């Protein structure tokens, strides 16, 4: 039986009385299980405490490890820990298969060599180049070397990959992928399940997770980390269904909450992509890294923002302007439509700016697929055919799809090393935060640097979700003593929740959120300029101040979505602040975004010339470095620091460092 399905039925079957006077007795009667598992072997050890507030009794739980988030990264970390014998909780604000991983379309990269000779070192080279040399090469080494085994593991779990005629996993071409270190032409490295790879991957991992005795806390909203003496000792969460507060104490905590795409007005992200983990880390006084690097996917449906996978171009689709030109030949003569995403998005924007856009407003371009055989479209791109008809009214076998770059992915996030350990930077040195890990889009390992290659995100999920579990298993044993917390731990989180629940200002949550999203869209888009960024900083800071004037309408605790959306808005605001202040401070153009007032990349050397005889620029005078951002929660003031990019690989004899160069496609 599905553990989470059992959860749902159990919750529906018995609803607790929600008056505060009845809570404590209800929790203690033992008539309702708090830990929902696959086979029901575990007994609840929950204890009720009123140390924080008599109005909000807190239910305490204890685990070896807690994973926050149940998308691809969270599920892989959770069942990896359970498989190793750890008593593991998985806290998720969504039913696992509703996580945003399900929306990924194109595929997952791995140098399997099923279509032609391939090598993971070529994949490594492409990823470093795609990152515009802001990626950490030790983490990229780890990810690309682990990629083939990770895909085979998924196949063994039952993931139904598309196949070649001889039964091998089918691999399509994807942007920025090459053979022989960029000298051997286009690589076919992207393993896929038609154009629904994320859907298949998430359901495969979810099905696998049900083999293990993991405790699921479904539709619980994580409020904050429980930090003591610089260590993470768990999380405090709100049960959305009944409004109860839960402290989940654990020796190790893994954040896998996804990205913060909803800081922007037009994006491919689900409405639940609200940067919850990123904000939790910020409130804990820890840094976030490289949040200014936001990826604009070249092909979102014009007017809707829905994703049209890069796999369309991998299958032979082409971008055309109003004159019918295949314009990418001008900007990327070799890769053309399969250049990296930053190159394609900027090229599309330039075509529109120069008057060659399509439609009455000349404000988009076309993605043409109707020159491809209908049988190929039906087999390789069935989801896109359906999406284009629903959201654009287009029959892809007869007419092109109107597309426009739209926010798609966050390269930045919580800084980690290649083992998934969350980092702080002290006196020029990286230090791990005891008990805290992160993976997936919430994390910044940094394998994507300033620009992610398509189909590396699903790879990131499974490789680093697994890495977190392995790293914890190396440093801890199941049943190790769980550190204690103060009796009033989480008090500030409950006070904040109460304040928002009874907020009676003048601004609706939806109104303030829309103002933030439109400001980010207009002030921090693909092309950026200093004066506009400065105006955006002032605007977002002002909007952050407006959080004090919010008005909520639902005062209850049962399924209070008004309260949950307001908590999510707080999280989005923290992400937006760090994004726009980091963007304003970075006086160069690197990766996804492009500064029109600083059009060149600023490295420690001028790599357009031989470096012999050049003097290396001091760290303070170049921008090949990671941004670390902190926010004063009370004032909204953003503080920026910087840490070096890691250029060494894990083993130089096995995988040589790729030295910086001027990127071209």
Curated annotation (Swiss-Prot):
Protein source organism: Bos taurus
Similarity-based family: Belongs to the FAD-dependent oxidoreductase 2 family. FRD/SDH subfamily.
Catalytic activity, as annotated: a ubiquinone + succinate = a ubiquinol + fumarate; (R)-malate + a quinone = enol-oxaloacetate + a quinol; (S)-malate + a quinone = enol-oxaloacetate + a quinol
Cofactor: FAD
Function: Flavoprotein (FP) subunit of succinate dehydrogenase (SDH) that is involved in complex II of the mitochondrial electron transport chain and is responsible for transferring electrons from succinate to ubiquinone (coenzyme Q). SDH also oxidizes malate to the non-canonical enol form of oxaloacetate, enol-oxaloacetate. Enol-oxaloacetate, which is a potent inhibitor of the succinate dehydrogenase activity, is further isomerized into keto-oxaloacetate. Can act as a tumor suppressor.
Post-translational modification: Phosphorylation at Tyr-216 is important for efficient electron transfer in complex II and the prevention of ROS generation.
Pathway(s) of this molecule: Carbohydrate metabolism; tricarboxylic acid cycle; fumarate from succinate (eukaryal route): step 1/1
UniProt enzyme class: oxidoreductase
Subunit structure: Component of complex II composed of four subunits: the flavoprotein (FP) SDHA, iron-sulfur protein (IP) SDHB, and a cytochrome b560 composed of SDHC and SDHD. Interacts with SDHAF2/SDH5; interaction is required for FAD attachment. Interacts with TRAP1. Interacts with LACC1.
Regulation: Enol-oxaloacetate inhibits the succinate dehydrogenase activity.
Binding site for FAD: 70, 73, 92-93, 99, 101, 106, 222, 276, 441, 457-458
Protein's UniProt name: Succinate dehydrogenase [ubiquinone] flavoprotein subunit, mitochondrial
Active site: 341
Record membrane topology: Peripheral membrane protein
Encoding gene per record: SDHA
Any one GO MF annotation of this record: succinate dehydrogenase (quinone) activity
SUPFAM superfamilies named among the record's database cross-references: FAD/NAD(P)-binding domain (SSF51905), Succinate dehydrogenase/fumarate reductase flavoprotein C-terminal domain (SSF46977), Succinate dehydrogenase/fumarate reductase flavoprotein, catalytic domain (SSF56425)
Residue numbers bearing the Tele-8alpha-FAD histidine modification: 100
Transit peptide per record: 1-43
Positions bearing N6-acetyllysine: 168, 180, 183, 336, 481, 486, 499, 518, 539, 551, 599, 609, 625, 634, 637
Compartments where found: Mitochondrion inner membrane
Assigned EC number: 1.3.5.1, 1.1.5.-
Keywords, alphabetical: Acetylation, Electron transport, FAD, Flavoprotein, Membrane, Mitochondrion, Mitochondrion inner membrane, Oxidoreductase, Phosphoprotein, Transit peptide, Transport, Tricarboxylic acid cycle, Tumor suppressor
UniProt-listed Gene3D superfamilies: FAD/NAD(P)-binding domain, Fumarate reductase/succinate dehydrogenase flavoprotein-like, C-terminal domain, succinate dehydrogenase protein domain, Succinate dehydrogenase/fumarate reductase flavoprotein, catalytic domain
N6-succinyllysine PTM positions: 180, 336, 486, 499, 539, 616
Annotated PROSITE patterns: FRD_SDH_FAD_BINDING (PS00504)
